[in-house]
């Protein structure tokens, strides 16, 4: 008799994975969570009395080919942080507080301990972002993915008062652009990274002097979460626009927050470019503009504020929360982005 397990799908392994992840999932729960693990849908009680006109904000993203680094390192407990960060950093650009998160893990073979490590990272990211992990799917897909590989994606939902949505509409010429430091490459550009470095397990274990760590540790660094910083900052200062520097780097993402007819001049040298980007540029013989069109270059998020408060915002951020820099200015003479 042929069984589902004979076809490569181990239902019992799925049950074991759920058992192992249970405590991590439950530590993300907020009081609004109305379900336990294992339901068909995650229930979340929206406290709409806190808002006059509540607006839900959603976002979805994945970790991309950074996962190939995790496979080589056999390290799976931080890529979940990347997954959460990619989603919640997007929705906080609208000023939204993340409420809950769902994950999707597709893999060639369900190894419960590995799945539990992935979910631990997701839970760590959710705790840092203040959102609840209320659902997920682990899909074992033999013959579709290699046994030791998986893909990881997530979905976040947040809320913002309609009158407090940050949409860039108030940005004007003369406003300053503030950059918040990244932790490293984050989760974009890894196809180019892998082409340049051709990483192997042996290469990833090598100590790189200019990085101050091994290549593997540098490449696997989790994406920085900016949620608590932005939610705190917007209660104290008027933030006119926010751009999450992801795929497309500076050149694609910063103009997305600008009203039509405006552009940005970014001042080269106004923040420290991280050594990993210098290494990639040198080894790959990359054009500088290609770098700015692919990587975050050491700045993971940018915010636009009135020029009169820019120094105060930077000073506030640098007290103990972030490394922040005034990196440019909004202009009216040219649309798009210029590095000068």
From Swiss-Prot:
Molecular-function GO term, any one: ATP binding
GO cellular component term, pick one: cytosol
GO BP terms, alphabetized: 'de novo' IMP biosynthetic process; adenine biosynthetic process
Enzyme class: ligase
Pathway noted in the entry: Purine metabolism; IMP biosynthesis via de novo pathway; 5-amino-1-(5-phospho-D-ribosyl)imidazole from N(2)-formyl-N(1)-(5-phospho-D-ribosyl)glycinamide: step 2/2
First-listed, main subcellular location of the protein, grouped into a coarse class: cytoplasm
EC number from the UniProt entry: 6.3.3.1
InterPro entries to which the protein is assigned, alphabetical: PurM-like_C_dom (IPR010918), PurM-like_C_sf (IPR036676), PurM-like_N (IPR016188), PurM-like_N_sf (IPR036921), PurM_cligase (IPR004733)
SUPFAM superfamilies assigned to the protein according to its UniProt record, in alphabetical order: PurM C-terminal domain-like, PurM N-terminal domain-like
The keyword ATP-binding is annotated on this UniProt entry: yes
Reaction equations catalysed: 2-formamido-N(1)-(5-O-phospho-beta-D-ribosyl)acetamidine + ATP = 5-amino-1-(5-phospho-beta-D-ribosyl)imidazole + ADP + phosphate + H(+)
HAMAP family linked to this entry: AIRS
Protein name listed in UniProt: Phosphoribosylformylglycinamidine cyclo-ligase
Organism from which the protein derives: Acetivibrio thermocellus (strain ATCC 27405 / DSM 1237 / JCM 9322 / NBRC 103400 / NCIMB 10682 / NRRL B-4536 / VPI 7372) (Clostridium thermocellum)
């Amino acid at each position: 008799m042929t069984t589902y397990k004979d076809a490569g799908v181990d239902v019992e392994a799925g049950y074991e994975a759920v058992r192992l992840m249970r405590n991590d999932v439950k530590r993300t729960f907020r009081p609004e969570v109305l379900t336990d693990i294992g339901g068909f849908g995650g229930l979340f009680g929206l406290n709409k009395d806190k808002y006059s006109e509540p607006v839900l904000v959603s976002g979805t993203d994945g970790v991309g080919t950074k996962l190939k680094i995790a496979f080589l390192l056999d390290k799976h407990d931080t890529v979940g942080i990347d997954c959460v960060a990619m989603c919640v950093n997007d929705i906080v650009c609208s000023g939204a507080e993340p409420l809950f998160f769902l994950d999707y893990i597709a893999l060639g073979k369900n190894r419960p301990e590995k799945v539990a490590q992935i979910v631990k990272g997701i839970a760590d990211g959710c705790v840092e972002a203040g959102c609840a992990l209320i659902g997920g799917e682990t899909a074992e897909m033999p013959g579709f993915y290699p046994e030791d590989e998986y893909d990881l994606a997530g979905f976040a939902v947040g809320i913002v008062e309609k009158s407090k949505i940050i949409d860039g509409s108030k940005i004007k010429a003369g406003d300053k652009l503030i950059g918040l430091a990244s932790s490293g490459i984050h989760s974009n550009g890894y196809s180019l990274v892998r082409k340049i470095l051709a990483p192997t397990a042996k290469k990833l274990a090598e100590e790189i002097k200019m990085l101050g760590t091994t290549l593997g540790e540098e490449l696997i660094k989790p994406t920085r979460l900016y949620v608590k910083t932005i939610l705190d900052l917007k209660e104290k200062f008027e933030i006119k626009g926010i751009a999450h520097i992801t795929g497309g780097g500076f050149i694609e993402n910063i103009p997305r927050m600008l009203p039509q007819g405006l552009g940005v001049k970014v001042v080269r040298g106004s923040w420290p470019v991280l050594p990993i980007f210098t290494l990639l540029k040198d080894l790959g013989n990359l054009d500088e503009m290609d770098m700015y069109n692919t990587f975050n270059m050491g700045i993971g998020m940018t915010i636009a504020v009135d020029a009169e408060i820019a120094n105060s915002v930077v000073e506030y951020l640098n007290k103990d929360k972030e490394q922040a820099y005034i990196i440019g200015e909004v202009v009216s003479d040219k649309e798009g982005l210029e590095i000068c």
